[in-house]
Every structure is written in C-alpha cells, then in structure tokens.
Amino acid sequence: MDVFSKANVKDELCQNQRCVNRGSSRAYVLRIMTIKVAINGYGTIGKRVADAVDAQDDMEIVGVTKTRPAFGCDLAVRKGYPIFCTYDDVDRIAAFGAAGYTCHGGLSDLLEIADIVVDCSPGKVGASNKDKYVAAGIKWIFQGGEKHAMTEHSYTSSANHTENLGVAGTRVVSCNTTGLSRTLVPLYEHCGSLSVECTMIRRAADPGDSSKGPINAIKPVLKVPSHHGPDVMTVKPEIQINSMAVAVPTTLMHVHVVVATLPEGHGLTTESVLSMWNERPRIVIMNGSETGITTTAEVMEFARDIGRKWGDLHEIFVWEDGVKLEGNTLYYFQAIHQESDVIP
C-alpha cells in the first residue's frame, strides 16, 4: 500500500473509531466521568486542541478564551464553544458584547468551572498564568512556548507518557522538539545510547501571522545551542543532543537536518531504520524522487490532497531517499508542520 492510501486509511480508522465511540458506548462513558476542559488561547494551536478535545467521549470544552473580539470568535461560535475573555477586566469583557459576541466572563470565571486548562496562549506569559491555575486548584497543560524550569515537567507521547501521569501540570514541548523526539526516541530505544547534532531550518511565521519575519533574509539563531535539541533531553535525558537554528522566509514548515552517531554494534541498516520509523505512529516516509514530493510545498499540498482539516500534517515527514546510514553515522532530513504535530 502506498503512503497516500496509508494516510487515508489512518484517517478513515480515526473517523470510524470516533463513530463507534460516539455510538452505544457514549452514554455509558458520559455517566462515568466527563472532564471539563478550558482552552486558554483560542488561536493557531488552541483551535486545533479544542477540536481534538471535542472529539473525545469523556471530555467537553467548557470555554475558550480570546484577548479581544476578532474573527476567531466566529469559529468558536460555529463550534459551539463558550467564549471567555483572557482578562478579568470588566471593560475588556464588555467589548465582546459590544461586538455582538456572548462573553461568559473572564479567565477566572472559566477556571471555576473547569477541571483542567490547556494553555495555548503566546509564550512568556506562562508564569503568571500558572499562578492563576494553581490558585484555582485545577490541572494545567502548557502547549509549548514556556521553559521546562517553569513547568517542572515536559511531555511528548513518543518519549515519556507514563512519567507525566498524576502530575499537577506539564508542558507539551515545542513542535521542533516533538518532531525530533518522534524519530530519535526509537533509535535510542534500539541502540541504548545516541549522540546527535542537528540544524533547524525554521519557518519565519505561521501562515496566519502577518507580524513576524524575516521576509527577505536568513536569520540565524545566535544563541548556541538553540533550545530545540537540549529540550529533547527534558523528555528523554539519555539522548545527547545539540542543535543550531536559522529562520528562513517561508510559512509552510520547519526542516531538520539530523546527524546521529550510533554506538558500535548497533546492528542497523538504512532499511531497518526506515522500517523502525514506519512502525511508529505519526511518522510518514515517502520517496521524494518517486513521488515528486521534494519540498515542503509539496508536503503541504499532499496534506490538503488527503483531506486533512486546515491542511494539517500531524505526522513527521521523512524523505526516504534523504536517509543514509554510513557505519555508525545516520544522516536524514525531516519536515515538521509546526501548526499540528503537537496536537493530541
């Protein structure tokens, strides 16, 4: 089966399972427990997380926040998600009503009715938000944008799921760290040790963001190493990794150039590495020369062609013909859709 068919099958399986879950078992599940979820920050990541939560039988969205009345509110209304203001300021809350939206209160009001909050707000406001969540006595998850030191726990499903069970709160690591973990953790689990050097070729901004750049430059991240590689060690400390990064004028995806040093006696070949990744969820491997998918533009077109919502590609995209193991050194390229790979 080709990858195009494989991707469609994955989507169909998800849809079928959702139908089954929403069928005869739904009432039974709802009788047991429904987790009330708040989304603080209904933007690029928040709207995707909200839909993922809404698809679950044992969870419900009790509210999403916006800083001000804007076009994102229309989507929340269509989805049936109650709107709250990010702030508790009376005038800011009233602005929603003046713009024609029903606003159910401020963030404090939302936290009072939630069991857990998923924080999808911009970075650098996490510390103050965390204080509010702790005071409200609810669980919390930060969707990237914050440092491990602030949250004390980090999470990605491919690396440390069980270690995060029962904690008061955690952060989902960034899109780049998530992507690195997806392909590096299987290698580490096979080899027992791993040393990695990688370069992040980062998109300048998300497609819907008109305020960032560069638009006519290549901008190196002059903090060395960049945070992406060391962040992998917050979810899998045993992997030794460093990274550097540059931002380029595109909005589509990030690309990683990875050089991994495997231990002596690893027993792997290029083919067995590809087979290992093929067995993992959320990794798509395609041959660029055979398919014509040789750039991130075609990868995103592929995601649209298979009918993905918002044109998302939740999987990490690996070019098969860009993978080569020579002795103990593994070279490969992978592409990361920054808007969706961190979504549950």
Model feature map: region roles:
Residues 91-129, 142-148:
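Rossmann-like NAD(P)-binding element
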